[in-house]
């Protein structure tokens, strides 16, 4: 797979009649004359021509089919090669309505806006939920911030009203602040303060910082504040996937601090937390088609701290002890590495009742020779964030005895494709005898496998047809160019004669 351009994920605001400009690197733009766009609204792959880095022929039709509305925040994600997945941010409407007055205090047009009112900061929260630095200099605190569509679109991070900077100019003039990632790379941003609310906000570089460090909409990131130099510094300690679980507090240990105090609005905890080993993923239609489950290397401290530095074999495991051999491929640029699981995960989801558009939680276990990703729980649709009920878990567990060819605790099933559940399986299955697999079940499994193979073949067939058309067009252009050169040569020869 071709490494993704930088950035591999970005957002644009849809305007009727406007042709969006893709924020891609020069290398990608110079080597491509078109892109292939996909969305959840249609199974069709749309070929859209590029005019430089601007979407041209075919974009209007794609926008019409997907019913994009004026002002929608569109999220572009590179899926490899020329394919980009386009979706409407689910929070774009809410954020635009909630933060309408924020634009009045946005300082990107001129410096005089710094003193205007910012209604979104009146609640003392902003985009962060956090932190007050203790007077004791030996006590360190985290800044817990959430990446929202508004913060990416406006290139601005609103901080909690309770958060203070000792080095900020007493006359409330904007100053510079450094954001430093875990590799030591530094970004210079602007720190300003709203006079009416007293809340701080960071701008002019926040979106670039998120893109370079793999931070996407819904993620939570944790910073440690340092004011030992001439300018305040926020050190990125970790970040975790959000996906609507704002109450999940599995903060990771910051490598920069010896004694940490993880703070929130409700108070502080002196306990250290180990790196998060849990990854929240969504089973999207595009991932079903490509068979690739993308995971950011920064989406979990456990993934980064586990020592996974290159591609290799992994094992997928569910709560019933069933195993699927798989492969983890790592790619991307330093500071924005990401990886994807290539095979086995769709079969694991199917066996555990995880359907398209469902979310699920994977737990990373590195006790064996190969890393293990364990399916920890399923999350219901529509963003409710509820874990699948025990009744449904029991119903899914019954399918264990009917799933052919799956390894359970190192043992294979019988010759007829049946499997046996170990003593460590769900207590619901204790004492149950293995049941025979019916012919209809086996036929259904084979049929599903054939359908999966057909979908994959159709996907690559569409890509091959597109490439074939491009090559044919190139041949025609070369023929026309040859005729022009021949004509010019004849004219020159006649003039010389």
Curated annotation (Swiss-Prot):
A GO-annotated cellular component: nucleus
Database matches in Gene3D superfamilies: DNA-binding pseudobarrel domain
S-adenosyl-L-methionine among keywords: no
Subcellular location field: Nucleus
Pfam families linked: B3 (PF02362)
Keyword list, A-Z: DNA-binding, Nucleus, Repeat, Transcription, Transcription regulation
Residue segments, region Disordered: 87-135
Residue ranges flagged as DNA-binding region: 7-92, 142-239, 278-379
GO BP terms, alphabetized: flower development
Source taxon at top rank: Eukaryota
InterPro entries, sorted: B3_DNA-bd, DNA-bd_pseudobarrel_sf, REM_fam
Expressed in which tissues: Specifically expressed in the reproductive meristem.
SUPFAM superfamilies per record: DNA-binding pseudobarrel domain
Coiled-coil segments on the chain, per record: none
GO molecular function: DNA binding
General function of this protein: May play a role in flower development.
Annotated PANTHER family: B3 DOMAIN-CONTAINING PROTEIN REM-LIKE 3-RELATED, B3 DOMAIN-CONTAINING PROTEIN REM14-RELATED
Protein name: B3 domain-containing protein REM1
């Amino acid at each position: 797979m071709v490494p993704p351009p930088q950035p591999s994920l970005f957002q644009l605001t849809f305007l009727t009649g406007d042709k969006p400009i893709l924020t891609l690197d020069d290398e990608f733009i110079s080597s491509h004359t078109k892109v292939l766009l996909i969305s959840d609204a249609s199974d069709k792959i749309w070929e859209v021509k590029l005019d430089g880095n601007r979407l041209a022929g075919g974009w209007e039709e794609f926008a019409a089919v997907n019913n994009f509305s004026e002002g929608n925040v569109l999220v572009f994600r590179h899926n490899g090669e020329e394919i980009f997945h386009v979706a409407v941010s689910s929070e774009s409407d809410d954020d635009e309505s909630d933060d309408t007055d924020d634009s009045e205090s946005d300082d990107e047009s001129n410096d005089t806006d710094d003193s205007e009112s910012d209604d979104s900061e009146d609640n003392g929260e902003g985009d962060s939920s956090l932190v007050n630095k203790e007077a004791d200099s030996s006590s360190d605190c985290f800044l817990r911030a959430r990446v929202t569509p508004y913060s990416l679109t406006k290139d601005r991070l609103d901080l909690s009203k309770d958060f203070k900077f000792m080095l900020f100019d007493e006359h409330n003039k904007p100053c510079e602040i450094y954001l430093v990632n875990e590799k030591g790379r530094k970004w210079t941003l602007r720190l300003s303060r709203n006079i009416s609310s007293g809340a701080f906000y960071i701008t002019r570089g926040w979106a670039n910082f998120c893109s370079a460090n793999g931070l996407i909409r819904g993620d939570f990131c944790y910073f440690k504040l340092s004011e030992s130099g001439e300018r305040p510094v926020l050190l990125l300690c970790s970040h975790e996937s959000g996906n609507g679980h704002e109450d999940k507090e599995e903060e990771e240990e910051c490598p920069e601090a010896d004694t940490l105090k993880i703070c929130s609005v409700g108070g502080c905890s002196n306990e250290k937390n180990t790196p998060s080993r849990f990854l929240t993923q969504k089973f999207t239609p595009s991932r079903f088609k490509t068979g690739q489950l993308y995971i950011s290397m920064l989406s979990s401290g456990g993934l980064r701290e586990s020592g996974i530095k290159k591609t290799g074999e992994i094992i997928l495991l569910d709560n019933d002890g069933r195993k699927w051999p798989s492969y983890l491929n790592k790619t991307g640029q330093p500071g924005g590495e990401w990886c994807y699981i290539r095979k086995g995960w769709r079969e694991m989801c199917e066996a555990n009742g995880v359907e398209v558009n469902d979310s699920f939680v994977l737990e990373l276990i590195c006790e064996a020779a190969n890393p293990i990703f364990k399916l920890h729980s399923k999350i219901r649709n529509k963003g409710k964030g509820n874990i699948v009920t025990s009744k449904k878990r029991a119903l899914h567990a019954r399918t264990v005895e009917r799933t052919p060819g799956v390894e359970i605790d190192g043992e294979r099933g019988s010759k007829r494709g049946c499997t046996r559940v170990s003593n460590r399986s769900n207590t619901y299955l204790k004492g149950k005898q293995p049941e025979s697999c019916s012919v209809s079940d086996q036929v259904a499994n084979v049929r599903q496998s054939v359908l999966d193979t057909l979908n994959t073949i159709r996907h690559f067939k569409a890509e091959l047809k597109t490439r074939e058309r491009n090559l044919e067009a190139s041949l025609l252009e070369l023929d026309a160019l040859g005729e022009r050169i021949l004509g010019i040569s004849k004219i020159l020869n006649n003039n010389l004669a």
